[in-house]
Amino acid sequence: MFDHISIQVASFAKTLSFYTAALARLGYVPQYVDDTAKSAGFGPEGDVRLWIAEGKPAAKVHLALRSPSREAVGAFHTAALRAGGKDNGKPGLRPDYHASYYAAFVFDPDGNNLEAVTHEAE
């Protein structure tokens, strides 16, 4: 089990705005923001799990974040698109993964594939 993950982003301000809007629907909120160092940490209250920092982005990554419900998956997708993300898979079942795998995918401003997923049966 990982403790946290950190990704480099091309524009801290743009990505901070995107992740703040998109991740709130999953219960991930900014826990730490340093405009001088151009870094921020997101997670559930009191627990930072995802860090972003301005720098030279590395290879594109796929981040799958657990969602509390199918409704939250849909809300994440809508919020991410409104915040400037690009659709990479509308909310829905992915039976090729397993019968109750419900997910949505968006590309963030740097082209990383961000996924919200729940494994709960409806």
Regions found by a protein language model. Name each.
Residues S11-A13, L65-D110:
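Vicinal oxygen chelate
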Residues S6-V48:
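Core segments of cupin and vicinal oxygen chelate
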Residues K38-R82:
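Long, continuous compositionally biased terminal/linker segments
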Residues M1, K56-A59, H98:
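Short glycine-enriched loop/turn motifs at secondary-structure junctions
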Residues A116:
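Short glycine-/small-residue motifs
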Residues N113:
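Glycine-rich acetyl-CoA-binding "A-motif" of GNAT/NAT acetyltransferases
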Residues M1-L16, L63, E120-E122:
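N-terminal beta-strand motif that seeds the catalytic metal site of vicinal oxygen chelate
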